[in-house]
Amino acid sequence: MLEVVFSDSEKGSIRVAKTYDAKKMKGGAVGYIGEKPRKAQVKKLLAQMEQDLEGHALGGSSDEVVNIGFFLDVGDISGEIDGIGRRNVFRTLWSRFHFREEEEDQLFTEQRNELEKLMAFAEEGKAIRIWVSNAPYSICGLL
C-alpha cells in the first residue's frame, strides 16, 4: 500500500512505522523526582511502560511512502504543481539558505518522481492511503 503524506517529517515517520520492530528499536530514558524508587517498583513501571508502548508495523516497504510537498499552503496554487510559480515560492521561503540551482532542481525532481509514483499506483488500481492532518500544507495537499 502506498502511503501519501505532505511533509518530509511525516514521510520519515511513516517510513519508520512501516517497518517498526519493537525488539530492534528499544531506547529511551526514565527519570524520577524525589526519593529514588525501589528496584521492584522501577521494574514494575518499566514493564508497564513497555506494554503501553508496544506497537506493530504498518507493514509493507518503507519505499512505499511519498511526500507530495511543493509548499502548497503558500502562494498561488493555480499553476502547475512543480511549475515556475512553485519554484518562486521555494526561493522566497528558503532563499536565506542559498540553495544552489542543482539542489533546487534535485528537490523538484524528487517531488515530481513521488507525484508520478502516486499516479502510477492510482492508474494500476493499487491501494493508497492518504495521511491528512489539520495543518494547512496537509489540507492544501489533499485538495
Region roles according to the model:
Residues 1-101:
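A structured, charge-rich N-terminal accessory region that forms the first stable segment of a protein
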Residues 77-80, 139-143:
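Short, conserved acidic/polar surface loops in the N-terminal third of protein domains
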Residues 95-142:
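Long, hydrophobic/aromatic-enriched structural stretches that serve as scaffold segments
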